Structures are given as structure tokens and as C-alpha cells.
Amino acid sequence: MGKSRILIIGATGYIGRQVAKASAALGHPTLILVRETTASNPEKAQLLESFKSSGITIVHGSLEDHASLVEAIKKVDVVISTVGGAQIADQLNIIKAIKEVGTIKRFLPTEFGNDVDKTSAVEPAKGLFALKVKIRRAIEAEGIPYTYVSSNCFAGYFLPNLGQPGLTAPPRDKIVIFGDGNAKAVFVKEEDIGTFTIKSVDDPRTLNKTLYLRLPANTFSFNELVALWEKKIGKTLEKVYVPEEQVLKTIAETPFPGNIIISIAHSIFVKGDQTNFEIGDNGVEGSELYPDVKYTTVDEYLNQFV
């Protein structure tokens, strides 16, 4: 059996570009759906050129244009959505088109974070996660084969400044820690998320399951992360612990979109939502399924900042 033909919707976005690159690199015939106007953005135009040179086919269309969706989906076996937060609900249009085409072997909706079915997040993250839950239930109700990729933290969002807003490098004097710093989280380099995602599309073990990236070398509590950084720079940082009550107050007082970021951080670093449950029968873990993937460890990632 040849490798599945893959359509990626949202391929010019932050995680979408990594998924698209991995798809081409792993030898899948890859199509991306982009609006005709995308090429008028210079940064996106350059990205589209690099996609073309790696053999990716560009098709024009959008989530609002049903005919374009159907036309693109007819050409492939697998659909991956990596659309951003503002378009989560619009994935109902993808579901409708997949249903109409009727030949899709797998749909991966936009996930790439915490498992939204296992969360104790507060608003506004709670509402954002609820939209993803709604999409999951719609996929299941239509009987569309799926894989949900729960890849946890993007390394690039968090590790370059150890979660300290406004800093461009990890701190060398003082660090603010939410909660007691003991909840464990998982930090995965974006390129590796792309690789694990594409590895899963033709794998019967991930069919109608959640693929968790709970990579052993990348699972750290905040305290462990700080200790690793201190060891690298040979210096002890002053640690400021923010109790949960204060974190909740900050969320309530912070305007959008800052409150979303803090409420997601609360879910991860105070509640431990990435690791506070066992992976059950409806889940599989990426590094166990694909031991051949040499992912970048947190230890290696931090070396660039020393």
C-alpha cells in the first residue's frame, strides 16, 4: 500500500507549516489548501515557494467555500486541520465536506495541545477547549475515522523564556512559578510534533484514538525545569511562587487575549492537566509507537540559550 495522500488545511500557520514539511519529508503526496490572497503576504509567499520546492501541491480554497473544500478533499485519503483558534468552529464545514466526499480514511482536527476531554481549565481557556470538544463529538457522530493529536506544550512558545512574559531568553536572576511548581508538563519541539503527527496517519494503532506525545525525556515539572536551567548556567535563581488563588485573580483581571494564555498556563502548570491522568484504552503514546523518531530533548533544546 502506498503512502496516503494528505490534505493540510491551515498549512501556513505556526504548527501547520511543520506538519506540511513533515508530510513532504516522509514521502506523502501532500496538498495544502490556501486562500488565493495568502500569496500577497510576503512571508507567506516565501513559505509557499519553499512548500512548492519540496513537492507540495497548492490548491486554492477556504473553509467558507464548500465547493473548494469538496474538490480538494476528493483528491486525498487523509485530511489534517491545523487552523487557529478563531477557526475551530468552522471545522464543521470540513466535517460536512468529508461526509459528502465519503472516501476519507482519516481526519485529524486541529488539536495539538492539552487533551480537551480531560481538562480542568477555567475560562477563557475552558471555552476554547469546549469548541474543540464540540468538533470531536461531531466527527464521532458522523462516523468519520479520526486521530486526535494531543501534543502538549509547543517548546518554542515556552522554553525560550521559561514561560516568563516579555523575556527573549531564559532568566538568569529571578523566575516566577505558578502554583507549587510540582505539576508535570510536556514540552515538544514543533518539528517533532509534525513528524509524530504524520507518522500516525497510516497507522492502524492510532485509528479512532488520541495520540499523546508524553515524551519521557521532555516531561518536567516547573521546578525540575528550573533546576536543569540552573545547572546549565551554574547559578541559582530567585524563585517567586504564585499561589493558585492569585493566578485566578490575574486571569480575571487580564484583558483578552492575555487571559487565554494565563488560563492555559493555569491548566498546565497548576492543575497538571497534561499528565494528571493515565492514558487509557482510547489513547496511545507517540514515543512508544515510534521509538525510531529521534526527538529533540528539553535538555538539548535549552543548550542554545546557555
UniProtKB/Swiss-Prot annotation:
The keyword Ligase does not apply. Its EC number is 1.23.1.-. The active site is at residue 132. Highly expressed in sclerotesta. Expressed in roots, and two-to-four year stems. Keywords: NADP, Oxidoreductase. The keyword NADP applies. Induction: Induced by UV-B, wounding, salicylate, ethephon, 5-aminolevulinic acid and abscisic acid (ABA). InterPro entries: NAD(P)-bd_dom_sf, NmrA-like, NmrA-type/Isoflavone_red_sf, PCBER-like. Disulfide bonds: none annotated. One of its GO terms (molecular function) is oxidoreductase activity, acting on NAD(P)H, oxygen as acceptor. It catalyses: (-)-dehydrodiconiferyl alcohol + NADPH + H(+) = (S)-isodihydrodehydrodiconiferyl alcohol + NADP(+); (+)-dehydrodiconiferyl alcohol + NADPH + H(+) = (R)-isodihydrodehydrodiconiferyl alcohol + NADP(+); (2R,3S)-dihydrodehydrodiconiferyl alcohol + NADPH + H(+) = (S)-tetrahydrodehydrodiconiferyl alcohol + NADP(+); (2S,3R)-dihydrodehydrodiconiferyl alcohol + NADPH + H(+) = (R)-tetrahydrodehydrodiconiferyl alcohol + NADP(+). NADP(+) binds at residues 10-16, 35, 44, 136. Pfam families: NmrA. GO terms for biological process: lignan biosynthetic process. It comes from the Eukaryota. CDD domains: PCBER_SDR_a. It is an enzyme of class 1 (oxidoreductase). PANTHER family: ISOFLAVONE REDUCTASE HOMOLOG P3-RELATED (PTHR43349:SF93), PINORESINOL REDUCTASE-RELATED (PTHR43349). Belongs to the NmrA-type oxidoreductase family. Isoflavone reductase subfamily. Oxidoreductase involved in lignan biosynthesis. Catalyzes the NADPH-dependent reduction of phenylcoumaran benzylic ethers. Converts dehydrodiconiferyl alcohol (DDC) to isodihydrodehydrodiconiferyl alcohol (IDDDC), and dihydrodehydrodiconiferyl alcohol (DDDC) to tetrahydrodehydrodiconiferyl alcohol (TDDC). May regulate changes in lignin content and accumulation of flavonoids. This is Phenylcoumaran benzylic ether reductase IRL1. It comes from Ginkgo biloba. The gene is IRL1.
